[in-house]
């Protein structure tokens, strides 16, 4: 295969600017699938992706395009990427396997927060960026304004940018020409050098075992080759290899410059790490390819199976998901209230949501999640720094000097009409104003420094509602800062409930604790004695609600008669309730925790 006829590219864009639809049209245009096989979002393989209309997993396909200009067949390797801020890691991995990127911009929405961050990722990987203006068939499309925005904010020349409608398939041929003319072929790849293949993704197949998606940088790999993973020196014999078109197509050999998949009967999921380099065991490469910087989770939460008998199944399921999503981290934990569970680290709230939904759908495991938390740094009295991801791990107040929390630089692009609302929201969430610049005549980009914990605490939903859905957010972690943070414990009848302990800012502690207490009061069933629900910081009670006792009518058998008789019965009841309260345990049904934690 001549290298000059190969093009490796990905499609990047903000959410809803039409990446997956454009991928569909490109696949259609190359006649890779028959009309019967085509369906919308063909590259989004998970049901969740189709339902939510978002891309979560990157996906790589090989397309053959016959160019009428020079009468040649070109091999396009298209890698579809997610657009949501939580899945930036997926984008960076797919870009490392390409030479170019199509930057899709919506002709009515223009440049948005995620558009910019994806451009920076592409520039970091030295990719050739081809701007594409999409949705030109919309009545609200303003092509000239969007072209000027791209030129001003990103610095890309848009004079020859393809103007397309991915929905109707208008001008898709312009994109094909731009891919051939502007994206460079992988000429630095050499079939004769020792094998170097970058693993940019992996998934689990019930029959083939763990399957690696690879970009062959140098050399070639055949069925029967003994391959070696350079990070752990484990060796395997290749049992099958090929490409996706999006159908799985088996081949005998993959050569330098190609993007495909390799199966080698790998049973242990942990043998594969994304970003690793595969080489030939008989003729190994001396150096591995530069992989990816390991991304660290931003949000932690405990996941517990509602049915405790499913715990072992849950562990297996999480291992399988981990294979295709190496940004997930997990460790085993137990809770008095919820039993055995796993504490997981996620890239953001959407990532957490998606993993929970995948566990529910693909493995039929219903889960309960504790309140999400970020990583705090605790400066101990002896000067060492302890990193904690849950309130349960916070040491006693006497053992540390201060708590630091992560701050994020949040860039919000918002129409002028909603600027006041957005700035007020940021102030309410402990935001610190940094910058305000014009994006165009009707929109501003405002930059705030906001604690990551606040972004996790319903900030995104509030941002959408206060801007009627028009504001877009992009954030990155900047640094850790000392804050007045406290641990709030919830007591039921004087007993601490570990699953409900949280770390929060002192300023918001009483208000948020009151909400938790009220929620508990709604859901806890009545007992024979009254139950105090208290939120405490150390020994100080900052919020309290009471679940009143069930009252048995002890006077029912007294018809008239002496009042002292009635008083005596009421006194006896009062004494009994007092005794019960001292020795009685509050039994909180498991589904009460499910309700409380799912509402939080």
Curated annotation (Swiss-Prot):
InterPro entries hit by this protein: EF-4, EFG_III/V, EFG_V-like, EFTu-like_2, G_TR_CS, LepA_C_sf, LepA_CTD, LepA_IV
One Pfam family matching this protein: GTP_EFTU
Keywords, comma-separated and alphabetical: Cell membrane, GTP-binding, Hydrolase, Membrane, Nucleotide-binding, Protein biosynthesis
Molecular function GO labels: GTP binding; GTPase activity; ribosome binding; translation elongation factor activity
Compartments, record wording: Cell membrane
EC number(s) per entry: 3.6.5.n1
The keyword Amino-acid biosynthesis is assigned to this record: no
Catalyzed chemical reaction(s): GTP + H2O = GDP + phosphate + H(+)
GO cellular component, one term: plasma membrane
SUPFAM superfamilies xrefs: EF-G C-terminal domain-like, P-loop containing nucleoside triphosphate hydrolases, Translation proteins
Major localization listed first in the record, in broad terms: membrane
Residues where GTP binds: 16-21, 134-137
Biological processes, Gene Ontology terms: positive regulation of translation
Start and end residues of each tr-type G domain: 4-187
Enzyme class name: hydrolase
PANTHER family attached to this UniProt entry: TRANSLATION FACTOR GUF1 HOMOLOG, CHLOROPLASTIC, TRANSLATION FACTOR GUF1-RELATED
Protein's job: Required for accurate and efficient protein synthesis under certain stress conditions. May act as a fidelity factor of the translation reaction, by catalyzing a one-codon backward translocation of tRNAs on improperly translocated ribosomes. Back-translocation proceeds from a post-translocation (POST) complex to a pre-translocation (PRE) complex, thus giving elongation factor G a second chance to translocate the tRNAs correctly. Binds to ribosomes in a GTP-dependent manner.
Stored NCBIfam families: lepA, small_GTP
HAMAP family membership: LepA (MF_00071)
Family: Belongs to the TRAFAC class translation factor GTPase superfamily. Classic translation factor GTPase family. LepA subfamily.
Protein name as catalogued: Elongation factor 4
Biological classification of the source: Bacteria, Bacillati, Mycoplasmatota, Mycoplasmoidales, Mycoplasmoidaceae
Gene (name only): lepA
